[in-house]
């Protein structure tokens, strides 16, 4: 089992050094989990800007930074659409050094994050807001990404034997 260890040292009121120990052959999912753990540990801190020195990371862990940042981003999700008082701002991570994620990786991670957050938003909406008609309306907007979308009416759903779905959507 992968053991993650994050230790921080406060050097002044404005500066903290954070050390993260890594295993030699860190998998992508473990790097994401490490990012999530980092976010959990520091999300309530007064510090919102962090720097990651990628030169201290072995080049055979090529995708570590991208996966680490991806884990932070996924963990930072908050559904605050109906909150009157929003939580404080997101943390900012600046990567310095040679081992930074390339543009293709950043684009891939960004696309995954947008899709994940869109799905989480749909799941978090209350039923009186996201009823079947509203859900169909929102899903139709995804056709601009090349998705083929077919919206079934009640008659078609009955014909397909989806009675439970019809019952839930009443």
Go through each PLM region and give its residues.
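Short amphipathic alpha-helical segment within the helicase RecA-like ATPase core
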Residues: 1-170
